[in-house]
């Protein structure tokens, strides 16, 4: 058993979660800190459930959907790194939210994706829905809440581009998605259904999440899980650990960070393969451990290994893990046989690592997500 867009500058004159990459050979300590829209505002044209993805020459081709479920919000990113939120002279607003980032990342790489979630019936909510549409993401599964605002997150950047977050929620619209609002047709016809853990924090979204994943599983859809731990959003660390692990054994693909291994195993060594293997449940097809600039580790029932990352100048690490997920899911959606072929899986993970590396060179998450052409160019230039 396993262990249970365009940016605009705004001027403004808690508890945090810090993410820092680590190398296996350099074992530095790891710390964990603690309704439907108006038709006039959005296009309601419905995409085919087997999407029309853009190819490199601008033509369209059919591609299986990756449906992403969860939160979409506004990140406010400081224009100057190395300052506290109180001292930051200005912020740029950028669309974000891990599942939405993955959906846009897949579409930008030429795949087909859809997003299911809830935003406020406010200017930010309409902006986010239109950003999805503008990035060729099916937004038919989006819902709008007239009584709650779109979630906001203020991001503090260190001089090295690492992040701390302050969230404005409680409640925000993403927490209020109800099971009755789900687009089950979209869910059941997906190739991959991807989600995080933030949608498990409160009702009614928790029940909607569980129902959506259950429907996908029963329809034979591959389930992809990135816990994306944001500890300040949870009532307690114990509650976060319990809920994150409560759906662990239903997932087919899981991506975690070194920090999340430490958290989920209550302090065990994330560099020890025996520790990581405790998180590999019997029905899991692929477990991925991201290591920032060092790359990633991969584990299947039959093989495991590491794929080195690309070294780049870091501006902002926001969205890097989501870009990595988009990179690997875009490959798997078209060919699940990669899971049985180590050589080809390694090539797909090199592609995913490059997606993450390119994202940290630009501020914000969605604005930084790369195209397939940019990824291939970076790989060609990389020194092995």
Curated annotation (Swiss-Prot):
Pfam families attached to this UniProt entry: PfkB
**Source organism superkingdom:** Eukaryota
Which SUPFAM superfamilies has this protein been placed in?
Ribokinase-like (SSF53613)
Keywords linked to the UniProt accession: ATP-binding, Carbohydrate metabolism, Chloroplast, Kinase, Nucleotide-binding, Plastid, Transferase, Transit peptide
Q: Which reaction does it catalyse?
A: D-fructose + ATP = D-fructose 6-phosphate + ADP + H(+)
Recorded GO cellular component terms are:
chloroplast; chloroplast stroma
EC assignment? 2.7.1.4
Which residue intervals make up region (Disordered)?
A: 34-61
What is the transit peptide's residue range? 1-46
Query: Residue spans with biased composition (Low complexity)?
Result: 35-48
Q: Which CDD domains match?
A: bac_FRK (cd01167)
> Under which main EC class is this enzyme filed?
transferase
Q: Pathway, per UniProt? A: Glycan biosynthesis; starch biosynthesis
- Coarsely, its chief localization is plastid
User: What is this protein's name?
Assistant: Probable fructokinase-6, chloroplastic
**Species, as recorded:** Arabidopsis thaliana (Mouse-ear cress)
């Amino acid at each position: 058993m396993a262990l249970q867009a365009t940016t605009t500058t705004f001027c403004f004159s808690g508890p945090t979660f810090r993410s820092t990459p680590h190398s296996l050979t350099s074992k530095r300590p790891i710390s964990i800190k603690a309704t439907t829209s108006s038709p006039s505002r959005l296009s309601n044209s419905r995409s085919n459930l087997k999407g029309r993805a853009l190819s490199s020459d601008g033509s369209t081709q059919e591609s299986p959907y990756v449906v992403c479920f969860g939160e979409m919000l506004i990140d406010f990113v400081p224009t100057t790194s190395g300052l506290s939120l109180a001292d930051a002279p200005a912020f740029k607003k950028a669309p974000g939210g891990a599942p939405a980032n993955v959906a846009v990342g897949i579409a930008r790489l030429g795949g087909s994706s859809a997003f299911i979630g809830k935003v406020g019936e406010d200017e930010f909510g309409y902006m986010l829905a239109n950003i999805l549409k503008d990035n060729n993401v099916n937004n038919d599964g989006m819902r709008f809440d007239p009584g709650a605002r779109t979630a906001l997150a203020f991001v503090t950047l260190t001089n090295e581009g690492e992040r701390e977050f302050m969230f404005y929620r409680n409640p925000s619209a993403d927490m209020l998605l109800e099971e009755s609002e789900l687009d089950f047709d979209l869910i059941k016809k997906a190739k991959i259904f991807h989600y995080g853990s933030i949608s498990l924090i409160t009702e009614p979204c928790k029940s909607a999440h569980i129902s959506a994943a259950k429907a996908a599983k029963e329809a034979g859809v591959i389930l992809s899980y990135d816990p994306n731990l944001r500890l300040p959003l949870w009532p307690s660390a114990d509650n976060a650990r319990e809920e994150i692990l409560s759906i662990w054994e239903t997932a087919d693909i899981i991506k975690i960070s070194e920090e999340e291994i430490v958290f989920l195993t209550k302090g065990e060594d994330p560099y020890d393969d025996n520790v990581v293997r405790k998180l590999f449940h019997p029905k899991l097809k692929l477990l991925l451990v991201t290591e920032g600039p060092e790359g990633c580790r991969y584990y299947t029932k039959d093989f495991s290994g590491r794929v080195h990352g690309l070294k780049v100048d870091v501006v902002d690490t926001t969205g890097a893990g989501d870009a990595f997920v988009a990179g690997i899911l875009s490959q798997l959606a078209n060919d699940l046989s990669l899971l049985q072929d180590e050589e080809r899986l390694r090539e797909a993970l090199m592609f995913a690592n490059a997606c993450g590396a390119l994202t940290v060179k630009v501020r914000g998450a969605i604005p930084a997500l790369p195209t397939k052409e940019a990824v291939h160019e970076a790989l060609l230039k990389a020194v092995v």
